[in-house]
Amino acid sequence: MELQLAIDLLNKEDAAELANKVKDYVDIVEIGTPIIYNEGLPAVKHMADNISNVKVLADMKIIDAADYEVSQAIKFGADVITILGVAEDASIKAAIEEAHKNNKQLLVDMIAVQDLEKRAKELDEMGADYIAVHTGYDLQAEGQSPLESLRTVKSVIKNSKVAVAGGIKPDTIKDIVAESPDLVIVGGGIANADDPVEAAKQCRAAIEGK
């Protein structure tokens, strides 16, 4: 089981500083969509240039022109790139092909997908590296969690890894870990903690069953 830190609300310098503080406890560091909107792909490059032994994910949330956008993210140092599960099949297939051609990985974000079971099966057959169930920020505000979606997707896929995101914190991560996802994505639960290093350490301990 892997742990990913999602960083959304910092500039690229502060994001790299935070990532380096917690890198002993995480497997993947994400440059979140808000940072990419604010600073562009150079934020991904800054992270890639300033951290080692950790994969860098660019949360592009691609919807179209997929092979080009994947190629650009890779050019700027991304190891993993995200595309939306609601994108056209042709876009997702092109994104997977471009990523794999460069020995990189593609994560498909299931945010806003209505028929999770059907789409997860399709994406699994297409060869997505990760399928991520994601309770977005706006739905978290309504008290929703990704647990049920995680169970649904995990029950139908055969090859892809299952990732889970959405409001996960050190005090709730054990419920998620109990469902045995392949990748747990924690954002503010680490980034906004009073002590991010301690929060990351607690999350790592939880996924290692300690």
UniProtKB/Swiss-Prot annotation:
GO terms for molecular function: 3-dehydro-L-gulonate-6-phosphate decarboxylase activity; hexulose-6-phosphate synthase activity; orotidine-5'-phosphate decarboxylase activity. This is 3-hexulose-6-phosphate synthase. NCBIfam families: RuMP_HxlA. Catalyzes the condensation of ribulose 5-phosphate with formaldehyde to form 3-hexulose 6-phosphate. It is an enzyme of class 4 (lyase). PANTHER family: 3-KETO-L-GULONATE-6-PHOSPHATE DECARBOXYLASE SGBH-RELATED (PTHR35039:SF3). It catalyses: D-ribulose 5-phosphate + formaldehyde = D-arabino-hex-3-ulose 6-phosphate.
